[in-house]
Curated annotation (Swiss-Prot):
GO terms for biological process: nucleobase catabolic process. Signal peptide: none annotated. One of its GO terms (cellular component) is cytoplasm. This is Pseudouridine-5'-phosphate glycosidase. Homotrimer. It holds the Pfam family Indigoidine_A. Catalyzes the reversible cleavage of pseudouridine 5'-phosphate (PsiMP) to ribose 5-phosphate and uracil. Functions biologically in the cleavage direction, as part of a pseudouridine degradation pathway. It comes from Gemmatimonas aurantiaca (strain DSM 14586 / JCM 11422 / NBRC 100505 / T-27). The keyword Cell membrane does not apply. Substrate binds at residues 89, 109, 141-143. Its EC number is 4.2.1.70. Belongs to the pseudouridine-5'-phosphate glycosidase family.
Length: 306
């Protein structure tokens, strides 16, 4: 017996925008509830939503709000997520359980992709995707498999720097996920400008990316398209500094027995400490830049630029 697919709840602004075919950009909530500590999470929410709005698109923060898959958080709901108390980290596999429990769930990249597919959103901005973990190739983020089967444009600064970036890029190729550089010929290093990992595709204008996406979909491709751009140069951190901080953070996590979903927030906090806060400045700036580019792509899609 087949079940009718659920339609996420949307705020009135998002619902009206969907009805008229306006440009929308999905934003994950996990970076706000687990990735960045207060007050930085509040600043991230403001900068990302303002960046999307400034280019003529509508920001849509995704979440499970008291058990309901939600597109767009009103002020009261957003404040609850920014306070972080009792908010779960929810990946795609956890969505149904969070709904059954009536829980507040902050959506990861994988879960946000799933909600985008249900809600009809084609563009999503985040900081960095998950991938293959260093020294543990069996530990692979659910983001990768979700990217392989969910047709959404994902704008990011590459995979998080704590990961095995060469292995992650190889997995994306195996899974049939196109990776397109915007303003770069290399995979960015999240906090760093480059990694030395060459990309096979580069498109520097939102209109070009929109055309490539339409062609991708016209061919019946069901995967996401990953659009990667480096962090702003004025806040980027040299790769050797990031690598040293990451290795020290991984060692600290191992000694502390950190496991599972707690690993990434722990490592990012350790890197923040070891870079004397530079990683937070870079994270905020790249989140804003990615939101802006995603908004420009969403507008280009709606305008149907030839």
């Amino acid at each position: 017996m087949s079940e009718r697919l659920l339609r996420p709840r949307a705020t009135s602004t998002v619902f009206e925008a969907l009805e008229r075919g306006a440009a929308l950009v999905a934003l994950e909530s996990s970076v706000l509830a687990q990735g960045l500590e207060p007050p930085y999470n509040r600043e991230a929410a403001r900068r990302m939503t303002e960046a999307v709005t400034a280019v003529g698109a509508i920001p849509v923060i995704t979440a499970i709000s008291r058990g309901t898959p939600t597109l767009g958080l009103d002020d009261e709901d957003l404040e609850r997520f920014l306070q972080r108390d009792g908010v779960r980290k929810v990946s795609a596999r956890d969505l149904g359980i969070a709904m059954a429990d009536g829980a507040d769930g902050a959506t990861t990249v994988a879960a946000t992709l799933a909600l985008c597919a249900l809600g009809g959103l084609e563009v999503f901005a985040t900081g960095g995707i998950g991938g293959v973990h260093r020294d543990a190739p069996f530990d692979e983020s659910a983001d990768l498999i979700e990217l392989s089967r969910t047709p959404v444009i994902v704008v990011c600064a590459g995979a998080k720097s704590i990961l095995d970036l060469p292995a992650t890029l190889e997995r994306l190729e195996t899974l049939g996920v196109p990776v397109v550089g915007c303003g770069t010929d290399e995979l960015p290093g999240f906090f760093s400008l480059s990694t030395g990992l060459r990309l096979t595709s580069r498109l520097d204008r939102p209109e070009q990316i929109a055309r490539a996406w339409r062609a991708h979909r016209a061919l019946g491709r069901e995967s996401a398209m990953l659009v990667v751009q480096p962090p702003p140069a004025d806040v980027a951190i040299p790769a050797d500094i990031v690598d040293a901080a990451t290795r020290a953070a991984l060692q600290a996590a191992s000694l502390a027995g950190i496991r599972g979903a707690a690993v990434t927030p722990y490592l990012l906090a350790q890197i923040q400490q070891r870079t004397e806060g530079r990683s937070v400045s870079a994270n905020l700036a790249l989140l804003e830049a990615n939101a802006r580019l995603a908004g420009q792509i969403a507008v280009a899609l709606v305008e149907g630029t030839p």
